Amino acid sequence: LKANNQMKDIIYVHKNPDRHYVVSYGIHFNEFAMNARKPLKNLLLIKHQYEHGAFNIHTHMEYVEKDEMKKIIDDGVQSYGDFCWIDFEEEVGVDELNGQEIAELLYMGHIKQPLNPPFYSKLNNRYAYLSHDDGWFNKVYYRDFEDFYYMLGATLSSKLSTMKSGKGLFGMKKEKPYPVIGKEVIHSFQDKLKEGMVISLEKAVLTRGKIEIPIWVIGDYYDMDEMAEDYKQIRKLPANGLLSYDRKTKSWSALLK
């Protein structure tokens, strides 16, 4: 059973620095794309159900050009099942991929794991994005983890700005959009990210002029049903850290326990 419904206001992230990927739950492709540090380039679609892509004859794969990005962002990719892509700079580079490299991309989409580090000079890609039921299980390879820190901080503040618990977060009139959580704040959670942590918007607390979002270290999961079950137990314990927003100075800080 997918505990999807009752778990929508949490984000799980586990960073594997050696292999350059992050596994996550609760971050969807549209959030990833709209909160990217640099706008996404063209996407070579490895596994998908998108019906408006252009066809690349050399690889027999479809692709999305950057000026068409809004279409795929609005397409509801979480209903595709598997959604896997790699970004690229120029189609000329895609046409230069050899048989071995095309085979590596197909293998990666199928197994959700690359045979070799999935960064190709021909594509000059920043990411390899592998998801199943997008937002439920996402595994993203980052050439530069700064892209991850920025995206996570921006996604969290945008989620907070749009959260609806029927009456807006905490039943208050909606505040102006929250500023992006700076990467130095996210950096403070380096070690916890490596262990696997949950950022719980559902357990956010409003205190005098502050919003505090608790964080629990929960471990390394591939099975998100299991993660959600374990989270329901761990959220009864004191949090391992907080993301704190000062509504007066409009600034974010990290509190580690």
How would you name each of these model-derived features?
Residues 1-210, 216-257:
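Structured alpha/beta or helical-core interaction and ligand-binding surfaces enriched in interleaved
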